Protein backbone atom coordinates (compact mmCIF):
# COMPACT_ATOMS: atom_id res chain seq x y z
CA UNK A 1 0.00 0.00 0.00
CA UNK A 2 1.00 3.56 -0.58
CA UNK A 3 1.63 5.77 2.34
CA UNK A 4 0.59 9.39 2.26
CA UNK A 5 3.54 11.71 2.60
CA UNK A 6 3.67 15.37 3.55
CA UNK A 7 7.01 15.81 1.86
CA UNK A 8 7.24 19.07 -0.09
CA UNK A 9 10.23 19.44 -2.39
CA UNK A 10 12.22 22.58 -1.83
CA UNK A 11 13.65 24.43 -4.79
CA UNK A 12 16.55 26.73 -4.29
CA UNK A 13 15.70 30.02 -6.00
CA UNK A 14 18.30 31.33 -8.39
CA UNK A 15 18.46 34.48 -10.45
CA UNK A 16 15.72 34.63 -13.09
CA UNK A 17 12.10 33.56 -13.27
CA UNK A 18 11.14 30.15 -11.93
CA UNK A 19 7.38 30.50 -11.92
CA UNK A 20 5.69 27.39 -13.24
CA UNK A 21 9.04 25.74 -13.96
CA UNK A 22 9.61 27.51 -17.25
CA UNK A 23 11.58 30.47 -18.36
CA UNK A 24 10.44 33.06 -20.88
CA UNK A 25 13.21 33.26 -23.43
CA UNK A 26 11.93 36.25 -25.32
CA UNK A 27 9.69 36.83 -28.25
CA UNK A 28 9.96 34.47 -31.18
CA UNK A 29 10.05 36.26 -34.53
CA UNK A 30 7.08 35.61 -36.80
CA UNK A 31 7.88 33.38 -39.76
CA UNK A 32 8.22 35.30 -42.98
CA UNK A 33 4.96 35.24 -44.92
CA UNK A 34 5.14 34.82 -48.66
CA UNK A 35 4.24 37.94 -50.57
CA UNK A 36 0.48 37.69 -51.30
CA UNK A 37 -0.54 37.82 -54.92
CA UNK A 38 -2.61 40.73 -56.05
CA UNK A 39 -6.28 39.79 -56.32
CA UNK A 40 -6.43 41.03 -59.89
CA UNK A 41 -3.90 38.36 -60.93
CA UNK A 42 -6.49 35.61 -60.52
CA UNK A 43 -8.60 34.51 -63.46
CA UNK A 44 -11.78 34.52 -61.36
CA UNK A 45 -11.29 37.98 -59.84
CA UNK A 46 -13.13 39.95 -62.59
CA UNK A 47 -16.05 37.51 -62.30
CA UNK A 48 -16.24 38.08 -58.54
CA UNK A 49 -16.13 41.85 -59.04
CA UNK A 50 -18.94 41.66 -61.60
CA UNK A 51 -21.09 39.44 -59.36
CA UNK A 52 -20.40 41.83 -56.49
CA UNK A 53 -21.75 44.78 -58.52
CA UNK A 54 -24.81 42.74 -59.47
CA UNK A 55 -25.50 41.86 -55.82
CA UNK A 56 -25.19 45.51 -54.81
CA UNK A 57 -27.82 46.44 -57.40
CA UNK A 58 -30.39 43.70 -56.79
CA UNK A 59 -29.27 42.40 -53.38
CA UNK A 60 -32.49 43.24 -51.53
CA UNK A 61 -34.49 41.04 -53.92
CA UNK A 62 -31.93 38.24 -53.64
CA UNK A 63 -32.01 38.37 -49.83
CA UNK A 64 -35.78 37.71 -49.93
CA UNK A 65 -35.34 34.77 -52.34
CA UNK A 66 -32.14 33.17 -51.02
CA UNK A 67 -31.77 33.99 -47.28
CA UNK A 68 -28.34 32.33 -46.88
CA UNK A 69 -24.62 33.06 -46.43
CA UNK A 70 -22.23 31.29 -48.80
CA UNK A 71 -18.46 31.05 -48.51
CA UNK A 72 -16.48 30.21 -51.65
CA UNK A 73 -12.99 28.81 -51.11
CA UNK A 74 -11.27 28.92 -54.50
CA UNK A 75 -8.32 26.55 -54.75
CA UNK A 76 -5.38 25.99 -57.04
CA UNK A 77 -3.18 22.89 -56.74
CA UNK A 78 -5.06 21.91 -53.58
CA UNK A 79 -4.38 25.18 -51.72
CA UNK A 80 -6.92 27.92 -51.05
CA UNK A 81 -5.94 30.99 -53.06
CA UNK A 82 -9.10 33.09 -52.72
CA UNK A 83 -11.96 33.19 -50.26
CA UNK A 84 -15.13 35.17 -50.98
CA UNK A 85 -18.35 35.44 -49.02
CA UNK A 86 -21.77 36.04 -50.51
CA UNK A 87 -24.10 37.27 -47.76
CA UNK A 88 -27.69 37.08 -48.97
CA UNK A 89 -29.17 36.83 -45.50
CA UNK A 90 -28.45 40.18 -43.86
CA UNK A 91 -29.41 43.71 -44.86
CA UNK A 92 -29.60 44.24 -48.60
CA UNK A 93 -26.99 41.59 -49.41
CA UNK A 94 -23.25 41.87 -49.80
CA UNK A 95 -20.28 40.12 -51.34
CA UNK A 96 -16.79 40.61 -49.96
CA UNK A 97 -13.37 38.95 -50.04
CA UNK A 98 -12.41 36.89 -47.02
CA UNK A 99 -14.14 34.46 -44.68
CA UNK A 100 -17.75 34.90 -43.64
CA UNK A 101 -18.24 37.39 -40.79
CA UNK A 102 -21.09 35.26 -39.48
CA UNK A 103 -21.09 31.47 -39.78
CA UNK A 104 -21.66 30.52 -43.41
CA UNK A 105 -24.66 28.31 -44.16
CA UNK A 106 -22.83 26.60 -47.02
CA UNK A 107 -19.11 26.45 -47.82
CA UNK A 108 -17.90 25.56 -51.31
CA UNK A 109 -14.34 24.40 -51.99
CA UNK A 110 -13.85 24.76 -55.74
CA UNK A 111 -10.79 24.70 -57.99
CA UNK A 112 -10.55 27.99 -59.88
CA UNK A 113 -10.84 26.35 -63.30
CA UNK A 114 -14.03 24.50 -62.27
CA UNK A 115 -15.48 27.71 -60.78
CA UNK A 116 -14.90 29.55 -64.06
CA UNK A 117 -16.62 26.79 -66.05
CA UNK A 118 -19.57 26.80 -63.63
CA UNK A 119 -20.21 30.55 -63.68
CA UNK A 120 -19.74 30.79 -67.45
CA UNK A 121 -22.34 28.04 -67.92
CA UNK A 122 -19.93 25.56 -69.50
CA UNK A 123 -20.49 22.97 -66.75
CA UNK A 124 -23.64 21.74 -65.02
CA UNK A 125 -23.29 22.32 -61.24
CA UNK A 126 -25.19 19.15 -60.25
CA UNK A 127 -23.12 16.93 -62.54
CA UNK A 128 -19.89 18.59 -61.40
CA UNK A 129 -20.80 18.06 -57.74
CA UNK A 130 -21.77 14.42 -58.28
CA UNK A 131 -18.53 13.87 -60.23
CA UNK A 132 -16.57 15.21 -57.23
CA UNK A 133 -15.19 18.27 -59.01
CA UNK A 134 -15.89 20.43 -55.93
CA UNK A 135 -16.87 19.97 -52.29
CA UNK A 136 -19.82 21.41 -50.40
CA UNK A 137 -20.16 21.49 -46.63
CA UNK A 138 -22.97 22.78 -44.47
CA UNK A 139 -26.49 23.04 -45.83
CA UNK A 140 -26.01 21.40 -49.22
CA UNK A 141 -29.56 22.06 -50.42
CA UNK A 142 -28.95 25.82 -50.25
CA UNK A 143 -26.33 25.42 -52.97
CA UNK A 144 -29.09 25.29 -55.58
CA UNK A 145 -30.12 28.80 -54.52
CA UNK A 146 -26.61 30.02 -55.28
CA UNK A 147 -26.95 28.51 -58.74
CA UNK A 148 -29.95 30.81 -59.23
CA UNK A 149 -27.79 33.82 -58.27
CA UNK A 150 -25.17 32.87 -60.86
CA UNK A 151 -27.83 32.37 -63.55
CA UNK A 152 -29.33 35.75 -62.63
CA UNK A 153 -25.88 37.31 -62.97
CA UNK A 154 -25.28 35.63 -66.34
CA UNK A 155 -28.45 37.29 -67.71
CA UNK A 156 -27.30 40.60 -66.28
Swiss-Prot record:
One Gene Ontology CC term in the entry? cytosol
**In which domain of life is the source organism classified?**
Eukaryota
Q: From the record, what ranges are coiled-coil? A: none
Residues covered by the SCP2 domain: 44-156
Protein name, please? SCP2 sterol-binding domain-containing protein 1
Name of the gene encoding the protein in the UniProt record: SCP2D1
Amino acid sequence: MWKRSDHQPKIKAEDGPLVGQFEVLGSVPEPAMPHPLELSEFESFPVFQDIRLHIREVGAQLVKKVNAVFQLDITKNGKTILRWTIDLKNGSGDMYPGPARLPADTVFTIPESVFMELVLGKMNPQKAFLAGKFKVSGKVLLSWKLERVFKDWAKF
